[in-house]
């Protein structure tokens, strides 16, 4: 039986269409885009085409606004550090949400060590950023606002259009990390008011090893990698032509298939969430309910009384690939900073799992997941001292304190019923 892949926000398989597009650039059109001969010209033309395709996906004004990097992490580093270094004379203050991706938060920490300052705007219990809190954080030395389009853990869709208006009204560039949403949600950088926006094509059926950074022509950006004058002098180094061709092909595919992808994942997300909450008691959805404020590919869940890492490992043995936010480090459980930022209790954070859907998932696969996961949870709870204490009334549930003790289907106080 084919394994079920529910970890699409980590990476996606390369689509056959993308794979077909990139193959010639490994063995036939292998030239260096900077070379003057026909091999270089063919590679250079391929880069130009990929810029057009990526620009079309996000409705950029010009293909010249597209820069290629080695990945989403480098794109974020270039956006944050590049704007900061280019704006030193104007100011040194950066605003970020408290739950940005580490590529952004760690870049900001690096800059703080160099004398920049940062305001980390808190979020509500669903991970939503209040635009008024961002407005209130602006000072005369603010040079950059960083808020992601969709959070990488919670799946919450942030109010980017409102933030774009605030940034524009104050003459401050807005950097939007769209790695989580690119290829899955409509993106229009002009309507958003984004000065910079990053994508990672391997998240929407492209290749790993390439990133995209949109930069509005008026956004000042210093280079952070020095060498040649590739990418308009803003990103030195010979371009990864096959991966960039793949980025363009994946962008074109996403633009063409976006309505179908969105509709399908919305349907599967609802079916999956409805089935899991019906069959697994003491299960919490982190982030907004499925709907207009949540990306349809993501379900972030807390399974009470067990550890998410254990469930992820057991699911893998049973042919289901999913992610766990919490991980064991030595004898302690490391809680994801995002879950801490939304105020999730540690007892729930340690039971965190993330299921992320893709266009190749089927209703039959969802049915298998709904048949399998409740049994795995019952098995782990049968081995859990916390579940045993809860069943004996010694501790209470953090999810539903007033519900009283309750066994899941197939569970007893001592574990799963024998088959």
Give residue spans per PLM region.
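Pyridoxal 5′-phosphate
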Residues: 1-419
């Amino acid at each position: 039986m084919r394994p079920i892949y529910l970890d699409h926000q980590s990476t996606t398989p390369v689509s056959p269409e993308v794979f077909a597009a990139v193959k010639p650039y490994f063995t036939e059109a292998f030239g260096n885009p900077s070379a003057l001969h026909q091999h270089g010209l063919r590679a250079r033309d391929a880069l130009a085409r990929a810029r057009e395709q990526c620009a079309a996906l996000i409705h950029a004004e010009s293909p010249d606004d597209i820069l290629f990097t080695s990945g989403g992490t480098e794109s974020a580093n270039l956006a944050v550090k590049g704007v900061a270094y280019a704006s030193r004379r104007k100011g040194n203050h950066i605003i970020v949400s408290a739950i940005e991706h580490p590529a952004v938060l760690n870049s900001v920490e690096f800059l703080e060590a160099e004398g920049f300052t940062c305001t980390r705007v808190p979020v509500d219990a669903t991970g939503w950023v209040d635009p008024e809190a961002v407005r209130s954080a602006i000072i005369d030395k603010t040079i950059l606002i960083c808020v992601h389009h969709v959070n990488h853990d919670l799946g919450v869709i942030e109010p980017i259009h409102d933030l774009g208006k605030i940034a524009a009204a104050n003459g401050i560039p807005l950097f939007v990390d769209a790695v989580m949403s690119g290829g899955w949600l409509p993106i229009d950088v002009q309507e958003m008011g984004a000065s910079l926006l990053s994508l990672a094509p391997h998240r929407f059926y492209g290749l790993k090893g390439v990133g995209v950074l949109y930069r509005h022509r008026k956004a000042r950006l210093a280079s952070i990698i020095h060498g040649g004058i590739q990418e308009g002098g803003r990103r030195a180094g010979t371009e990864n032509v096959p991966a960039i061709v793949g980025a363009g092909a994946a962008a074109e595919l996403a633009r063409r298939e976006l309505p179908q992808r969105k509709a399908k994942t919305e349907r599967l997300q609802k079916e999956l969430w409805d089935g899991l909450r019906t069959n697994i008691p003491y299960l919490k959805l982190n982030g907004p309910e499925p709907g207009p404020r949540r990306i349809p590919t993501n379900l972030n869940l807390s399974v009470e009384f067990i550890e998410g890492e254990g469930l992820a490992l057991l699911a893998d043995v049973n042919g289901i690939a999913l992610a766990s936010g919490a991980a064991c480090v030595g004898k302690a459980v490391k809680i994801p900073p995002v879950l801490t930022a939304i105020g999730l209790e540690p007892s729930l954070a340690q039971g965190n799992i993330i299921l992320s859907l893709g266009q190749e998932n089927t209703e039959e696969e969802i049915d298998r997941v709904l048949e399998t996961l409740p049994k795995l949870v019952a098995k782990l709870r049968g081995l859990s001292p916390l579940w045993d204490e809860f069943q004996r009334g010694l501790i209470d549930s953090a999810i539903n304190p007033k519900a009283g003790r309750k066994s899941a289907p197939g569970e007893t106080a001592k574990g799963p019923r024998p088959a």
